[in-house]
Amino acid sequence: QGTDLQAGVSSDQIAARVLGRETQLASLELAIDGRDFVGSCDDGFSCAYTNTISWANDTTPLPMENNPRVVFERLFGDSGSTDPTVRKARLAKDASLLDSVTERADDLSRQLGTGDRRKLTQYLDAVRDVERRIQMAEAQSDRELPVVEQPAGVPGTFGEHAQLMFDLMALAYETDLTRVTTFMMGREITGRTYSEIGVPDAHHPISHHQKDPAKLAKLTKINQYHCELFAKFVERLSNTPDGDGTLLDHSMIVYGAGMADSNAHASQNLPILLAGGVAGIGGRHIMYPEDTPLANLQLSLLDKLGVPTESLGHAT
């Protein structure tokens, strides 16, 4: 509780450790809600548990970015353009800055004690990761990219915001800038409203519906809205050529929620949807035995991705 964190590496980051070796960005973590919550959020537990679903290790939650402009800059740089000439100039400038940082760090290292030198080593490891990404980007800089305008910022409605984030995810896959993304459409205990679909009430209070028909109807509207936006993303992937098929053919997509019954805070029998050619045979509804951990499914999916993993969470 409090500021003490104890979770576990998430399946997306296990995949990123392997699949991310060949791309500019190992992974991309996205969200709709901001990171305005700090301290204790739910029953005295850290807000880190509700602000993200991606964990690098037991104690390191990864921040999820909700600003489309920042996501665009992570993918294509701050030049605001996907033009190859502009991108090359920006990469050369970034590489020059990193060379300067490394030289100064080497000089500083000789003047530090053991403890400070260890901290500097950690910092330099992060610098080398940035350097690796720049080198990867330089190798790919001649590639023709779709002409895309840099987003101005966060759109005004949930639907526009979610659609833009899904589009950026699809663009990241299409350009092979990353092969692993995680998108949290709604944080736990969210107070978001959905006036554009006729639901002005906050999401979290509605989820504790106590079987009130009016609240259930509104909750159903929200769930349908989320699914419709997700379906558009899947459709876009299915319409995007990729090698001998489409992006959807070569993708594995997992869509779901952390609760099956929000009114009772029940996390058993979670509804999980799989899409994409890598996810296996579609068009099926599979009922797992009672108390089967979700981690069992995640281990199977990692294996299909070519990332065999011995254990994960409470997998049996």
Give the location of each predicted region.
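Ligand-binding pockets and gating/stacking loops
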Residues: 1-316
